[in-house]
C-alpha cells in the first residue's frame, strides 16, 4: 500500500490518554450510527449513511495513549464510479508528546489520494469529523457526530455551518 494519503495534525492541551479515549469513542465524533466495537485490536465496526456510504472497518493496531490504526475491509460509495475506493486503505491516529507539554494527534488516511474520485468530498469530510468534531470531543467532552436519523442533506448542512 502506498504511504500517500490525507493528513490532519492537531495539538491539544489534554493528555495523550484523554486524546486516545476520544479517538476510540467513534460514536462521539463520527457517527452515532456505528455498529460494532471500536476500542480493541480485532474489533470491527460498520459506519453507514444509508444510500450514500457504507464501510466495514477493523482495528488492526491499538496502543493506549499512542495510536489507533483501522483497516477498511469493505467500502461502498453511491456517488463515485469505483464504489470501493476506500477498501484496503488504512486510517491512523498517532498520538505523541509535542512542544510545551502539549499532545499531538496526527490523523492520516493512508491510500486516500487525489486520484480518487471521492478525494475532495472525503478530504473535506475528514476535515470536519477529525478537525472539528473530534477536536470538540477532546476539548469540551462533546463532539458533533452524525445522528442516527441524519440523511446526507442534514450531514452536509452541519459540515457547511462549521466550515462557513
Which sequence ranges carry the predicted segments?
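Short, highly charged C-terminal tails/helix-capping segments
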Residues: 136-164
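Hydrophobic/aromatic beta-strand elements that line small-molecule binding cavities or substrate pockets
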Residues: 9-10, 55-61, 88-97
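Intrinsic-disorder/low-complexity, polar/charged segments enriched in Ser/Thr/Lys/Arg/Asp/Glu/Gln
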Residues: 3-9, 44, 54, 67, ...
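Hydrophobic ligand-binding cavity/cleft-lining segments
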Residues: 1-38, 163-164
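Short, intrinsically disordered, mixed-charge
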Residues: 21-29, 64, 128-132, 136-140
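Glycine-rich portal/gate segments that line the openings of hydrophobic small-molecule binding cavities
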Residues: 28-82, 163
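Beta-strand/loop substructures that line and gate deep hydrophobic ligand-binding cavities in soluble
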Residues: 79-128, 145-147
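Hydrophobic pocket/interface hotspot
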Residues: 19-23, 59, 70, 105-107, ...
Amino acid at each position: 500500500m502506498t504511504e500517500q494519503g490525507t493528513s490532519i495534525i492537531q495539538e491539544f492541551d489534554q493528555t495523550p490518554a484523554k486524546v486516545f479515549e476520544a479517538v476510540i469513542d467513534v460514536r462521539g465524533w463520527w457517527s452515532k450510527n456505528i455498529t460494532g466495537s471500536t476500542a480493541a485490536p480485532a474489533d470491527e465496526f460498520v459506519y453507514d449513511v444509508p444510500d450514500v456510504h457504507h464501510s466495514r472497518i477493523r482495528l488492526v493496531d491499538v496502543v493506549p495513549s499512542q495510536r489507533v490504526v483501522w483497516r477498511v475491509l469493505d467500502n461502498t460509495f453511491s456517488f463515485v464510479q469505483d464504489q470501493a475506493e476506500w477498501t484496503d486503505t488504512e486510517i491512523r491516529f498517532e498520538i505523541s508528546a509535542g512542544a510545551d507539554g502539549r499532545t499531538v494527534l496526527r490523523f492520516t488516511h493512508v491510500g486516500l489520494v487525489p486520484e480518487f474520485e471521492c478525494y475532495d468530498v472525503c478530504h473535506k469530510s475528514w476535515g470536519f469529523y477529525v478537525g472539528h468534531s473530534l477536536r470538540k470531543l477532546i476539548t469540551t467532552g462533546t463532539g458533533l457526530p452524525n445522528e442516527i436519523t441524519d440523511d446526507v442533506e442534514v450531514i452536509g448542512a452541519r459540515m457547511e455551518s462549521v466550515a462557513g
